[in-house]
A protein has these predicted regions:
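Central helical "cap/lid" subdomain
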Residues: 188-255
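Glycine-rich FAD pyrophosphate-binding loop
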Residues: 25-45
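Short hydrophobic core segments
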Residues: 9-11, 174, 182, 189-201, ...
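C-terminal catalytic lobe of FAD-dependent flavoproteins
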Residues: 273-276, 282-288, 294-377
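Dinucleotide-binding Rossmann-like beta1-alpha1 core, especially the glycine-rich loop
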Residues: 48-126
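Helical element adjacent to the flavin cofactor pocket in flavoenzyme catalytic cores
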Residues: 138-180, 189-193
C-alpha cells in the first residue's frame, strides 16, 4: 500500500485532538486526524460541557484558560454551534461556603478574575435555579461558557473538514508512531509533526512511558434530565459550595480550611467519593448534574447508585428546576496527573504525546494546542 503524507497528523478526535487540528489548520497546515472509533467516545463527550476559567490558578493557567476561551468562541461562532456565554455562580448555603466566596471575590479581581460577591437578593435576581430559602449569596464570575459536548464533538469535525480540508479517518486505530511515520491498519503515513492525544489509552502507543508517567484514571458519575418545559433557561452555570474545595484556584483562600474541615466532619461520604455539585444546560434544554471523582488505573464499569443519590441529595438543598427527572446516567473516565496540569512527552523530534488535562480538558484544550504548535514551529 502506498505511503501518504500530511503536514500535521493527529491521533485522537477528542476535544484536545480537535483543538490541535483547528490551530494547525488555521496556520495553513495540511491536517489529518486518526480516530480509532466511529466517533469520539471518551471523556470529551462525557462531561458538563463547561469552559471554566475561574477554576484555574491565577497566572499562567488562568491566562491559558482565557486564551482557550477566545479560540472556543471563534470556532463556535464560525461553525455556528450553539453555546451559552452565561458566566457562573458558586452558590453558598452555609457561612463556611460564603466565607470562601467572599474572600475569593476580594482577592480574585486583583489577579485577573472577573468576579464579584452577590448578596442573597442579587443571586436570586441572577438565577431562577436557586432556592430562595437556601441561599446566603454567591460568587459570580463572567467568564464561564456552556456547550453541549455531544454536539461540539460532532460538529467541529464537520466544520474542520468543510472549512479547512482537514481529513478525518474514523474507525482507524494507529498501531505505532516512529520517525514521524504513523502506521494504521490501512496504510502508513508520513508527517512533519505528529500529535498524539490519546486520552486514557495508556496501553496502545508508548506504553513504557505511560507505565512510569504517574498518570491515573479518574472515574466520574453524571446524569442528565430531559429538556426542561416551556424552554426554561438555567441562566448562569451553577456550582454548589462543595465545588470550592475541588478547583485549585480557590486554594488562595484562607477560609477554605474551615470549609474542608466542615465537610470532612459532617459529610465524609462526599470526600470519600470526591463529590461536588455542578449544573449545566445543553442546547436541547436538558440539565446535566454531577459529579464524583474516584482515582485508579482500573476504574470499575459499575455505577454506584449511592453516588448518584448523594449528588441529587445535595442539589436538592439549593437547586430549584421545573423537572429534575433523570433521563440519562453515565460514567466518564479521564486521565490526570497528581502534580502536573497535563503531561507532554516527546519521544522524538516532531512527535508530541499530550494527555492528562484532568477535569480541565474542555477549559484548556485550545490553549494547550496553541502552546504545542508554537513550540513545534
Amino acid at each position: 500500500v502506498t505511503e501518504r503524507s500530511t503536514d500535521t497528523a493527529i491521533v485522537g478526535a477528542g476535544i484536545l485532538g480537535l483543538a490541535h487540528a483547528y490551530i494547525a489548520a488555521k496556520s495553513g497546515k495540511k491536517v489529518t486526524v486518526f480516530e480509532r472509533h466511529p466517533a469520539a467516545s471518551g471523556a470529551s463527550i462525557a462531561n458538563f460541557g463547561l469552559l471554566w476559567p475561574i477554576g484555574q490558578t491565577a497566572g499562567r493557567m488562568f491566562d491559558l484558560a482565557m486564551k482557550s476561551r477566545y479560540q472556543w468562541l471563534e470556532i463556535l461562532q464560525a461553525a455556528r454551534i450553539p453555546y451559552k456565554d452565561t458566566g457562573s455562580l458558586h452558590v453558598a448555603c452555609r457561612k463556611e461556603e460564603a466565607a470562601v466566596g467572599q474572600e475569593f471575590a476580594e482577592l480574585g479581581p486583583t489577579l485577573g478574575y472577573q468576579c464579584a460577591w452577590l448578596s442573597r437578593d442579587e443571586t436570586l435576581a441572577r438565577s431562577p435555579a436557586v432556592q430562595p430559602a437556601a441561599v446566603v449569596g454567591a460568587l459570580w464570575s463572567g467568564t464561564e461558557i456552556m456547550v453541549d459536548p455531544r454536539e461540539v464533538l460532532r460538529k467541529i469535525p464537520e466544520f474542520l473538514a468543510e472549512q479547512y480540508g482537514v481529513q478525518f479517518h474514523w474507525n482507524c486505530p494507529v498501531h505505532s508512531v516512529e520517525r514521524s511515520r504513523i502506521v494504521t491498519s490501512r496504510r502508513t503515513w508520513q508527517a512533519e509533526r505528529v500529535i498524539v492525544c490519546n486520552g486514557t489509552d495508556f496501553e496502545t502507543l508508548f506504553p513504557d512511558f505511560f507505565a512510569q508517567s504517574g498518570l491515573v484514571r479518574c472515574r466520574l458519575q453524571m446524569m442528565r434530565t430531559g429538556p426542561q418545559p416551556q424552554n426554561w433557561n438555567l441562566g448562569p452555570a451553577i456550582a454548589g459550595g462543595l465545588t470550592f474545595r475541588f478547583y485549585p484556584s480557590f486554594r488562595i483562600c484562607r477560609s477554605l480550611d474551615a470549609l474542608r474541615a466542615y465537610i470532612a466532619q459532617q459529610m465524609p461520604e462526599y470526600d470519600r467519593f470526591g463529590i461536588h455539585t455542578m449544573v449545566s444546560q445543553a442546547s436541547s434544554g436538558g440539565l446535566t448534574f454531577g459529579d464524583s471523582h474516584e482515582y485508579g488505573l482500573a476504574p470499575t464499569p459499575f455505577n454506584r447508585d449511592c453516588i448518584d443519590a448523594m449528588i441529587l441529595r445535595h442539589l436538592e438543598t439549593f437547586l430549584q428546576v421545573p423537572d429534575r427527572s433523570i433521563a440519562e446516567r453515565w460514567y466518564g473516565v479521564y486521565a490526570k496527573h497528581p502534580e502536573e496540569p497535563w503531561v507532554r512527552y516527546q519521544p522524538e523530534d516532531g512527535v508530541d504525546v499530550i494527555t492528562g488535562l484532568g477535569g480541565a480538558g474542555m477549559t484548556l484544550s485550545f490553549g494547550v494546542a496553541l502552546e504545542t504548535l508554537e513550540a513545534l514551529c
